[in-house]
Amino acid sequence: MLKIIIPTTMLLPMTWMSKHNMIWINATVHSLLISLISLSLLNQLGENSLNFSLTFFSDSLSAPLLVLTTWLLPLMLMASQSHLSKETTTRKKLYITMLILLQLFLIMTFTATELILFYILFEATLVPTLIIITRWGNQTERLNAGLYFLFYTLAGSLPLLVALVYIQNTTGSLNFLIIHYWSHPLSNSWSNIFMWLACIMAFMVKMPLYGLHLWLPKAHVEAPIAGSMVLAAVLLKLGGYGMMRITTILNPLTNYMAYPFLMLSMWGMIMTSSICLRQTDLKSLIAYSSVSHMALVIVAIMIQTPWSFMGATALMIAHGLTSSMLFCLANTNYERVHSRTMILARGLQTLLPLMATWWLMASLTNLALPPSINLIGELFIITASFSWSNITIILMGMNMMITALYSLYMLITTQRGKYTHHINNIKASFTRENALMALHILPLLLLTLNPKMILGPLY
């Protein structure tokens, strides 16, 4: 694990020592090299004693998420260049420092062995994200968004700390690898139910569960491009990862407690998809679509079968790349039209034909077109939920239909029709932007050839 953590740490002095015209090149190239090194972790053997240590370990669940995290840093740096072009050199370096720190915390969170260490790093990711949103966001509402983000996440994760201390006192260990061998099934007593809720709530807020999701659209809409990308692609996956790790420890209570959350997630999935159909703000639409996709992941994790876990992992990776790409595309529109309202930025296909191609590909992967990994993840989840209860197929089918509807609504509103008069003289798309979109879509296309790399715990 140190072969990734140490080079990432060394990005910090490198950024501050770079000359002002070399900052972006240095940071992007070196972070890309780190992400290429991390690809070796995807080749997980069955008995991988190589990747275990007392502090950090990686298995087939954390490796795909870890690679996604490292892959995203160069993409965030590429996307942010235009947004920061008017800032001073020191501020650019500070911004890059925040992104690198965030990546460092995320890598360590995904690979921590001790639950308390996991909790500390889980909370540490909050600080750089908050600074990125409240310092570099576009509108003044960013302060309000930062406040929502901070208090939802903090209030959700405080009970987790108490529950972890309680588990430590009863079992004597908080190590992920050891605690599984503590074969003491939890009874349905009130104290255990409260402990279960305390453990799960932090991750439910982070996912977010429908009803606890109000911070997400605000934070997404007000964050700068890199903030939106990392929030959608990796920070939401922390919730899913934490739930997968902790629900297996709390069995068989999870099976008993899962029903209300399953119903709420399925209902929320339909609701947030329907909200997407009425959005005028492009970033807000993509944010709500994230909530509906993550509701599917919550359903999968709560069902607790091997198939559903595989589906959850696949959908998390697929959604990370897809939503990040959609935010990049929304940002390219915003930089040209200076508005997030979809009606003001319509008919762009005639002006930016190559961007329209990227829009089409992103929308199609978002609505889970075969053979994309989004579809593979959704099929696993739908199969698992159907075998859990036949009635769920109605809700799942409705969700897939509404997802297709809002994806096409987004595509048609932004790309088709006659363009408005105030966007006659917009700039053509840059090579940087096209490379950025290609680096998002290529992993998605390549993973369709070998999806078992990201199917998580079973492979």
UniProtKB/Swiss-Prot annotation:
GO terms for biological process: aerobic respiration; electron transport coupled proton transport; mitochondrial electron transport, NADH to ubiquinone; mitochondrial respiratory chain complex I assembly. It is found in: Mitochondrion inner membrane. One of its GO terms (molecular function) is ubiquinone binding. GO terms for cellular component: mitochondrial inner membrane; respiratory chain complex I. InterPro entries: NADH4_N (IPR000260), NADH_Q_OxRdtase_chainM/4 (IPR010227), NADH_UbQ_OxRdtase (IPR003918), ND/Mrp_TM (IPR001750). It catalyses: a ubiquinone + NADH + 5 H(+)(in) = a ubiquinol + NAD(+) + 4 H(+)(out). The chain crosses the membrane at residues 22-42, 60-80, 98-118, 147-167, 193-213, 224-244, 257-277, 284-303, 308-330, 351-371, 391-413, 435-455. It holds the Pfam family Oxidored_q5_N. Its EC number is 7.1.1.2. It is a multi-pass membrane protein. Its main location: mitochondrion. Belongs to the complex I subunit 4 family. Core subunit of the mitochondrial membrane respiratory chain NADH dehydrogenase (Complex I) which catalyzes electron transfer from NADH through the respiratory chain, using ubiquinone as an electron acceptor. Essential for the catalytic activity and assembly of complex I. This is NADH-ubiquinone oxidoreductase chain 4. It comes from Sus scrofa.
